[in-house]
From Swiss-Prot:
Sequence ranges assigned to domain Lon N-terminal in this UniProt record: 6-199
Any one cellular-component term (Gene Ontology): cytoplasm
Catalytic activity: Hydrolysis of proteins in presence of ATP
GO biological process terms held by the UniProt record: cellular response to heat; protein quality control for misfolded or incompletely synthesized proteins
Any Pfam family matching the protein: Lon_lid
SUPFAM superfamilies found in the cross-reference section: P-loop containing nucleoside triphosphate hydrolases (SSF52540), PUA domain-like (SSF88697), Ribosomal protein S5 domain 2-like (SSF54211)
Enzyme class, spelled out: hydrolase
Protein name, UniProt field: Lon protease 2
Subcellular compartments: Cytoplasm
UniProt keyword terms in alphabetical order: ATP-binding, Cytoplasm, Hydrolase, Nucleotide-binding, Protease, Serine protease, Stress response
PROSITE patterns per record: LON_N (PS51787), LON_PROTEOLYTIC (PS51786)
Xref: InterPro entries: AAA+_ATPase, ATPase_AAA_core, Lon_bac, Lon_bac/euk-typ, Lon_lid, Lon_proteolytic, Lon_Prtase, Lon_prtase_N
Amino acid sequence: MLPETMPVCPVRGSVIYPTMVMPIDAGRPISIRAIDEALARDRVLLIVSQRDKEVETPRPSDLFEVGTACNILKMRKNPDGSVQVLVQAFARVRVREWLDLGDHLEARGEVLADEPGEPILVKALVREVKDKFQALLKEGKYLAPEVAQFILNLEDPSQLADYVAFHMDFRLEDKQKVLETANVAERLRAVLVLLEAELALIETQRRIQQQVKEEIDRNQREYFLREQMKAIQRELHGEEGEQEVEEFRRKLEALDLPPVVRQEVERELNRFARMHPDSAEASVIRTYLDWIVNLPWNTRTEDNLDLERAKEILERDHYGLEKVKDRVLEYLAVRKLKAERAKRGEIPPDEVNKGPILLFVGPPGVGKTSIAKSIAEALGRKYVRVSLGGVRDESDIRGHRRTYIGAMPGRIIQGLRQAGTKNPVFLLDEVDKLGISYQGDPAAALLEVLDPAQNKEFVDHYLGVPFDLSEVMFICTANFPQNIPAPLYDRMEPIEFTSYTEQEKLEIAKRYLLPRQLKENGLEPEQVVVTEAALTRLITHYTREAGVRQLEREIGALLRKAARRILEEGKKRVRITEKDLEAYLGPPRFLPETEAREPQVGVATGMYYTPVGGDIMFVEVSVMPGKGNLILTGQLGDVMKESARAALSYAKKNALRFGIPLEKFDKSDIHIHVPAGAIPKEGPSAGVALVSALVSALTEVPVRHDIAMTGEITLTGRVLPIGGVKEKVLGARRAGIREVILPKLNEPDLADIPKPLRQNMTFHFVEHLDQVLDLALVGGLKALEERGRRSRSARRKKELVAHA
């Protein structure tokens, strides 16, 4: 019979079975207290195994639910405070309730009685267990002879299973399962399975040992042959060739190469070992092996995916470009989430590196290359830049075959060797300027490089073996994305870099360009002061660009002249104001267009956009006696000429409505001119300005001078959307115009313009040319239509008089 409650003594790493007599060492307070309680009562102690042996003070949840009830036979206290007890186990016990008394644990439980199985089955299992046990002893499992014989002589099936489980090196969980199994047949079967697994493990170990022995024998044989070869090589070529081969061999053994690569490289190394070091082919193989051992096959940097740090770096190095920064941070956020899921085993590790190839699109000097460098710094990766401008040979990407003299790997492999890691940020600059020739299409070669489904096994012609590019973060840049072949462009995600506004250029000049140029020209900040007004005039009158490269050059020129003044005139401080610029840099190089001073007949203010920014332009129309010819000047492109013809057709169609005599078109020549004739002009966006100027010239109604317009037109009078809204509006603002006509469908594009720059400006969004003429002409559309009505009335009266 079991007591109502029993003190619990947790044990670590072992399981006790009924009928066993064994000593227990107890050093933990929770165990010593339990033993004291048992001795004070009926000397019955419940011994239970811990699930985790690292837990120092176990609670009920840390213990298994089946233990062994034991009688304490003897107890001895040690000088260090620990105790040793001799116990005899007498029953399996399943705990029904735990009692946590603070300084020790107690439990209420019930005896887990043996369930005898089918006699024939039990007898067979007993025989099998003893056979496997003996087989293990023969395989070298050491047990004291008297212990082994005692186990083999056991007749009780229950005790046989328990004693075998106790003396074998089974896992704690397996031993506990044997303790928890009440059915004797099932318990024997569980022990039999464990014995067979142990025998299988021993057989596997024996097979491994045999393989290792054979490998050692083969290595010894190879070593012997290699030493013979070395001796022959020394006789033929001296010590230098042998040392070189050994050096390559040591480096290759230190590399964790894929099997296919190792096989090919060892073949080349063996060929090299048999050659004279000074032969031409040996030189080719030597260069090849040098490339192989210096490539980062498994060297990588650990990604730093701290978004706050990345944001700080982007803000530190670049002003503006908010959309670009947001997209870069989104890209890093996705990589971080993927990396966390891969660590949890939810997605394969290869999925982490899969993602869009970023394509930075924009005019020169707007920060495409520098932001790629900032991304590398934010990620903690190496940075490599390869310029593809003018590349016309496929071998520049894939490498040259080794049959050619002076063959080298392609730029991709060269860049990876330069980086020293297999996961750098790799910038492919000017990808839109790739050429094509009889030597192949490098853009087609890039398809394999940039395709995540293929670049895991990119084969450079020079290497001749696959190299994994899947961990490389490729970023491309381009000025004109329309020049990129469609299959290549399809693999990229374009991110547009727009030209900087004047305000952005001013901030960039103050924060980055001026301090950098001061440092490069050996000046201290207190030696030269450039006023904000001077910088603004420098931007508007001495540069015309989308980025800030020319601006930095002009600042550099300004500071060099200031440095000369400091030395020649002995000045301690030079202050450069707006008025001083001409003395330092000469007369202004660019004079921005400004609004006309008063309304004029036949002159409308349009807007244009180039990669270096936007501005206004004047569309001039003159009507003169002639034969109905349309004259177009000002270097107009084909599309702009078509817009002019469409404007003329619209004017003819609405001639009576606007009071224009139809015969005027046949008896007059119409001359359309767009000033700055040396500059080519193209695009459909001047359509509304052409119509306004043309109708004004034909009706002699002036066009307002304080309003600028842009938009494509149709023959039916619809106004269609155009591009470059931000640059055009900023150009108009710079020219002093505060009222702008835009297509209705371009209304969302205003969000790209900074809010402070939209203030004090009026925007009219139109869908039809009637709305344009109502806004652009003095007096509006009503005055124009009234003129038409008067003209038609006068014509009818004239016809009636002539008829009478």
